Amino acid sequence: MTSPHLNYDTISDNYNQRYPSTFHWDRGDALLDLARQVDAKAVLEVGSGTGYWLNLLNQVTPQLYGLDFSAGMIAQARNQPTPLKLTQGTATRLPYQAESFDLLYCVDAIHHFGDHAAFVREAFRVLKPGGALAVIGHDPYGNDFSLYFYDYFETVYETDLKRYPSSSALKEMMKQAGFQNIERLNVEHVLSIYKGEQVLSDPFIKHNATSQLALLSEEMYQAGIERIKADVRRAQSNNEQAIFKSDFWVRMIMGMKP
């Protein structure tokens, strides 16, 4: 199944603005715990973006490798305080020798990889025996998943269903590739509630803050913003506040290479 492709070179300069410097991410703790569990000496992030998560793993090892399709993102990652070994390439044909890494992971990135099963097979190839694959992100197929901007921006939810593998499908891909001890873990609970006009300050609702919104034309994006503003005004006219709520779990699907 094909899905829209986002040119990250066009948004790389400001992409890290979505990560407030004072915010603590539980998914980062999960990554650190896993890296220590497998005693990771060499780590690869596929879809490494600006290097935000790789920089965190400097607490475990200095051998940090990142692969990204976007030259703009790689340029941004070179600004991280931690020296990173960065390569431009594709997730389905990893440019590394077999059995090179102790930990391979991606965060909020697998929906960009196209052939998810091919990525999982490549991950198995480049991991050392005893190494771990971790895929971290959300699952729009889940019944417990609620993201308020799905209700306001046309085509966004349908596009996500085309791009994301479900947790169960991803676990089956790992099994078919040869991974064992496959688990699905809830690693971070995202609960954000904006009241009234506060919603317009949500950093994740900026046009280029997420791939979901960045894929929209300016016209479609502004139409969604106007729908939000209309709900705010409608509530105000009734002496009420419109509530905009996102509530979901970030999941880590992980497996071990025997």
Name what the model sees in each region.
Residues 117-129:
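A short glycine-rich, Lys/Arg-flanked "PGG" loop and its adjoining helix->strand segment in the class I
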Residues 44-46, 50-93:
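Class I SAM-dependent methyltransferase SAM/SAH-binding core
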Residues 108-109:
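Short catalytic micro-motifs in class I SAM-dependent methyltransferases
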Residues 162-177:
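Short alpha-helix
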Residues 1-39, 52-56, 73-76, 132-161:
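Conserved class I S-adenosyl-L-methionine
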Residues 50, 183-258:
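Conserved Class I S-adenosyl-L-methionine
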